[in-house]
């Protein structure tokens, strides 16, 4: 991909975040011209706030949604099992955990082709990029937090994930 295509993808991301497609503006900062960082509040459940990080790469745009909690070392194996079970069957994105510090995030990626076709396709793709992570955090976040803090009512990790998917 050439630098003009990447510059165009950066402009599409900015247009979306600035409300240029639907009027919904996002609070964000630009870092190193190809990265955007911001926050989302008002989610329902135990995890009410998320941060988002958007990286415009050579051929893709990736968004990470992170919660303001980290898995303690002694919980990382259980959290890893939880996110592995949650990820099974997901088609657009996945949970990840950084074993070095316990950060858990939801990652969504779209290709340059999703942004280069036309404005309607770009808007739909950006909407998925920005809204899927919060949706997954709302779906799985309460039981993930329960597991992190030991409030599982003696339910297994498998039961906790199944409860999210009911």
Model-derived features with residue positions:
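Amphipathic alpha-helical segments
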Residues: 2-27
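Ser/Thr-rich, low-complexity intrinsically disordered terminal regions
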Residues: 19-46, 61, 67-68
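Short, internal acidic amphipathic alpha-helical interface segments
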Residues: 66-105
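Short, charged/polar, Gly/Pro-enriched secondary-structure boundary elements
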Residues: 43-48, 112-115
């Amino acid at each position: 991909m050439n630098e003009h295509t990447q510059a165009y993808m950066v402009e599409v991301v900015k247009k979306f975040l600035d409300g240029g497609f639907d009027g919904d503006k996002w609070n964000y900062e630009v870092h190193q011209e190809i990265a955007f960082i911001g926050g989302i509040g008002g989610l329902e459940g135990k995890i009410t706030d998320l941060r988002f990080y958007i990286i415009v790469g050579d051929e893709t745009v990736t968004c990470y949604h992170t919660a303001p909690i980290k898995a303690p070392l002694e919980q990382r194996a259980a959290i890893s099992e939880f996110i592995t079970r949650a990820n099974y069957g997901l088609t657009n994105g996945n949970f990840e955990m950084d074993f070095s510090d316990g950060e858990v995030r939801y990652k969504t990626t779209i290709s340059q082709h999703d942004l280069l076709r036309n404005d309607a396709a770009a808007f739909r793709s950006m909407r998925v990029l920005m809204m899927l992570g919060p949706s997954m955090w709302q779906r799985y976040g309460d039981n993930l937090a329960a597991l992190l803090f030991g409030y599982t009512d003696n339910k297994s990790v498998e039961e906790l994930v199944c409860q999210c998917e009911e």
